[in-house]
């Protein structure tokens, strides 16, 4: 029986959830969820100067918006410092690590001299093989004994086999002279203790894997499966930055992108399943595999994001969509909907969601059901309500009062009235849009009348005709 899959997302809480981090989290989530495994969350907060509770909260909020639920409690790397130190001392006791008494000044001087002579600046500690009897009574760091020759092969599921000559690796510090563990050690110990089977992360960590493998092998632990994914670039092929647009996951929520569309788009950034562009979460979980991840950086394309978001809005459940829109309004710092507006929005959703790519677009179309009497009208709407049009609307009102208020009945009544006036319905549509929405561009007149209901429709007509 194969070992259950366990993945993890391990961000540093020094800022918001970057869009690249969000994709890394998504890949780990999809891989675990599609295999009945576990997806764990670890906050790598060992850098106490830069780690903040606010950044941790922002990361958790970003993941919650994206719907990337994790198993178990959130793990704090900082809280595991004692365990990390324990492993360093175990390696020291087993002769796989050693005490290094070289000071920062000595190491800096060595590197400066090596650089001046055109030699490698890789530091080789003079304390590696020094007997303990010759050790001074002074602070020391604990360094791992890296292999001096041979090669380390990273068997990566995305990059293929990557070979590193061991001569390129130094005796990495495990424990600083103040007793604090370094990041490289903490990551390995945490991944092992959490039972992580697959490490899916950015390819900027690829070289770290060779150094981390030294610790796994020294401890006799199984090395996890590595998959180092390419970074995300902007549309111009350069590293994603502020000039390409928003960088934080929550910024996209505040701009009104649906989470399902964002998940779909991020999944397609660097991963593919044939020619499929649009897919649901369930399909993504079933299809996602490490073999489908490419080696080249993916390019962020806002138009593709919007197109996918539009498709997800179109198929969304009306009640769920209304709830997500209300969460968007909160995230964007906009006024909340009252109960009447909320109910009206959900009732009208069927005629709003087909062509909207973002929530602001959808809410613009929903203006007719969110506004209240007396309506404010834009310039085009005011122009449509000339005296002749108002007179025609006045004549139309009795015909609507007796209609059954089904779509078929309303269409029949309006077309019959237009024929009697020797005109076409299109001539009535402009004034009716102005009356019902105060705008010239709206959903179908019939959809607006159905959503508003008889009483509100007639009241808006009366406001204009008197």
UniProtKB/Swiss-Prot annotation:
Protein EC: 6.1.1.17
One GO location term (cellular component): cytosol
Catalytic activity: tRNA(Glu) + L-glutamate + ATP = L-glutamyl-tRNA(Glu) + AMP + diphosphate
Residue numbers binding ATP: 242
Principal localisation: cytoplasm
One Gene Ontology term of the molecular function aspect: glutamate-tRNA ligase activity
Protein origin, superkingdom: Bacteria
Database matches in SUPFAM superfamilies: An anticodon-binding domain of class I aminoacyl-tRNA synthetases (SSF48163), Nucleotidylyl transferase (SSF52374)
Keywords carried by this UniProt record: Aminoacyl-tRNA synthetase, ATP-binding, Cytoplasm, Ligase, Nucleotide-binding, Protein biosynthesis
Annotated coiled-coil segments of the chain: none
'KMSKS' region, short sequence motif: residues: 239-243
Database matches in InterPro entries: aa-tRNA-synth_I_cd-bd, aa-tRNA-synth_I_codon-bd_sub2, aa-tRNA-synth_I_CS, aa_tRNA-synth_I_cd-bd_sf, Glu-tRNA-ligase_bac/mito, Glu/Gln-tRNA-synth, Glu/Gln-tRNA-synth_Ib_cat-dom, GluQ/Sye
Cell compartments where the protein resides: Cytoplasm
Biological process terms in GO annotation: glutamyl-tRNA aminoacylation
Motif mapping: 'HIGH' region: 11-21
PANTHER family: GLUTAMATE--TRNA LIGASE, GLUTAMATE--TRNA LIGASE, MITOCHONDRIAL-RELATED
Assembly notes: Monomer.
Function: Catalyzes the attachment of glutamate to tRNA(Glu) in a two-step reaction: glutamate is first activated by ATP to form Glu-AMP and then transferred to the acceptor end of tRNA(Glu).
Family per record: Belongs to the class-I aminoacyl-tRNA synthetase family. Glutamate--tRNA ligase type 1 subfamily.
Protein name (Swiss-Prot/TrEMBL): Glutamate--tRNA ligase 1
Gene that encodes the chain: gltX1
């Amino acid at each position: 029986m194969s070992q259950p899959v366990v993945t993890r997302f391990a961000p540093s809480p020094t800022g918001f959830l970057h869009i690249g981090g969000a994709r890394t989290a998504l890949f780990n989530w999809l891989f675990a969820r599609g295999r009945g495994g576990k997806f764990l969350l670890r906050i790598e907060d060992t850098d106490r100067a830069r780690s903040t509770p606010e950044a941790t909260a922002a990361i958790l909020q970003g993941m919650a918006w994206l719907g990337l639920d994790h198993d178990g409690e959130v793990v704090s790397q900082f809280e595991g410092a004692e365990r990390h130190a324990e492993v360093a001392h175990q390696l020291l006791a087993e002769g796989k690590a050693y005490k290094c008494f070289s000071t920062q000044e000595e190491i800096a001087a060595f590197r400066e001299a090596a650089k001046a002579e055109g030699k490698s600046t890789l530091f080789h500690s003079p304390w590696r093989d020094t007997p303990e009897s010759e050790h001074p009574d002074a602070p020391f760091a604990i360094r791992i004994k890296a292999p001096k020759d041979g090669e380390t092969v990273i068997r990566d599921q995305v990059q293929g086999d990557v070979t590193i000559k061991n001569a390129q690796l130094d005796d990495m510090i495990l424990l600083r002279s103040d007793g604090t563990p370094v990041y490289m050690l903490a990551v390995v110990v945490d991944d092992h203790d959490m039972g992580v089977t697959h490490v899916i992360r950015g390819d900027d960590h690829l070289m770290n894997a060779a150094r981390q493998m030294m610790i796994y092998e020294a401890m006799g632990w199984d090395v996890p499966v590595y998959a180092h994914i390419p970074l995300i670039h902007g549309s111009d092929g350069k590293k994603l930055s502020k000039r390409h647009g928003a960088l934080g996951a929550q910024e996209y929520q505040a701009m009104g992108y649906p989470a399902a569309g964002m998940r779909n788009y991020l999944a397609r950034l660097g991963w593919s399943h044939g020619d499929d562009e649009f897919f649901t979460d369930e399909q993504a979980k079933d299809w996602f595999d490490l073999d489908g991840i490419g080696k080249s950086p993916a390019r962020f394309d806002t138009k593709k994001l919007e197109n996918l978001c539009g498709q997800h809005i179109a198929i969304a459940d009306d009640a769920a969509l209304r709830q997500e829109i209300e969460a968007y309004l909160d995230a964007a710092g906009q006024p909340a909907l009252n109960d009447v507006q909320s109910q009206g929005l959900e009732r009208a959703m069927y005629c709003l969601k087909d062509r909207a790519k973002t929530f602001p677009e959808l809410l613009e179309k929903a203006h007719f059901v969110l506004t209240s009497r007396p309506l404010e009208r834009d310039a085009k709407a005011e122009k449509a309500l000339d005296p002749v049009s108002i007179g025609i609307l006045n004549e139309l009102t009795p015909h609507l009062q007796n209609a059954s208020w089904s779509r078929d009945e309303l269409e029949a009544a309006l077309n019959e009235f237009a024929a009697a006036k020797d005109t076409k319905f299109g001539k009535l549509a402009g004034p009716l849009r102005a009356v019902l929405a105060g705008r010239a561009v709206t959903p179908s007149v019939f959809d607006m009348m159905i959503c508003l209901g008889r009483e509100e429709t007639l009241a808006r007509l009366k406001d204009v005709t008197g």
